[in-house]
Amino acid sequence: MPTFAPQHCTAVLASVTVVDAVAPHQLTLPTPCAGWDLAELLTHMTAQHHGFAAAARGHGADADVWRAERFVRAVADDPAGTYAAAARDVLAAFDTEGIDEKPFAMPEFGPNVVIPGEQAIGFHFVDYAVHAWDVAVTIGAPFALPDDVIAALVPVAMAVPDGDFRDADGSPFARALPSADHDDFARVLRHLGRDPGWSQAYSTVTGA
């Protein structure tokens, strides 16, 4: 298993706790993910869990396992239950001997892209630590990850490259924002194109 496996699990479970607090009327709220309301973000998060789980089991090359449209209705009907089931699926799939060396097919990164399991789980770790924050600030809920999770997250997240490709449609992250933060999680958020000060009020004023 990757060295950060326990911290990855903690981050995913933290995202489950945050999503469990989502109320139905909040699903139309805008999020820090430009162009996505909360229902769309949760649908994406649910689909990605199942996609990574399929990749861990050797089926990642099938584009259908990543398709978010499959979960639109389920998320609308039961966001917390649908999301928790997806999180359980991916954690079970990752809890396998030798998973860090196993090849993961990742068609979202390009045709025939295959990466080692440790790298794929690293991407997943970064995604869900940040998406948990996205959901929390969207609904105005408190959010904090344990120090050991942030310490494990920082080198993985800061290794994500920046560049013109982040301007492309479908890029997982916007361009990195300038940072003078001493808070490690805030540095991660800025490196991944998030403003740590984002709020619903901010979104309304700026149109973000």
PLM segments and residue spans:
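Structured surface interface patches that mediate subunit assembly and partner/cofactor docking
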Residues: 2-7, 11-14, 21-34, 51-71, ...
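Glycine-rich loop at the start of a catalytic domain that most often binds anionic cofactors/ligands
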Residues: 44-45
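N-terminal cationic and glycine-rich segments that engage phosphates or anionic surfaces
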Residues: 41
